[in-house]
Amino acid sequence: MRFLALGDLDFDPIRRTGYGEAPPLEPDLVRAQEDIAWADHLVWAYPNWWGTMPALQKGFIDRVILPGFAFKYREGKLLWDKLLKGRSARLLVTMDTPPPWYRWVIGRPGHNQMRHSVLGFCGVKPVRVSQFGVVKKSSPATREKWLRRAADLGAAGR
């Protein structure tokens, strides 16, 4: 197992140019790509803020999930090659929004973005989601139960 804590990485999360003009990746982002390439199962654990992922996570994706690494456009074609095929993923998402509200009223925008627009676009499947909430009203016993559930999923490789 390899572990990345985005807050500990040294990188500029702002994508300042298009793909063709991108500067070289910082060493921590090179290592992140190596870790993703090495893995057969990816686990993303993060809070849901304003319906989606935190800005730092989005910046990480913008800088790491790149053409030539995670996908490849086909010259003159609408389709693309999914270079992360053969991998699965689990999203562990905490939230203060009640999960039924997030699903049925808001439409799960953050989950959909990660499942389809990021990981699915690159060939990662299946992408399973475990959500934990409402955090701010949860008891220590409930949070302990959530941690055990996440640990059980990890032990099962799911």
Q: Which functions belong to the PLM regions below?
A:
Residues P67-K72, V124-R128:
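Short, structured loop/turn "capping" segments at alpha-beta junctions
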Residues M1-F69, K137-R158:
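N-terminal beta1-alpha1-beta2 submodule of the flavodoxin-like/Rossmannoid cofactor-binding fold
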Residues W104-R158:
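Glycine-rich phosphate/pyrophosphate-binding loop and the adjoining helix
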Residues L6-P13, K82, R87-R90, H116-V135:
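Mobile beta-alpha loop/short-helix "lid" or hinge segments that flank ligand
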Residues K72-F121:
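Short, glycine-/small-residue-rich phosphate/pyrophosphate-handling segment
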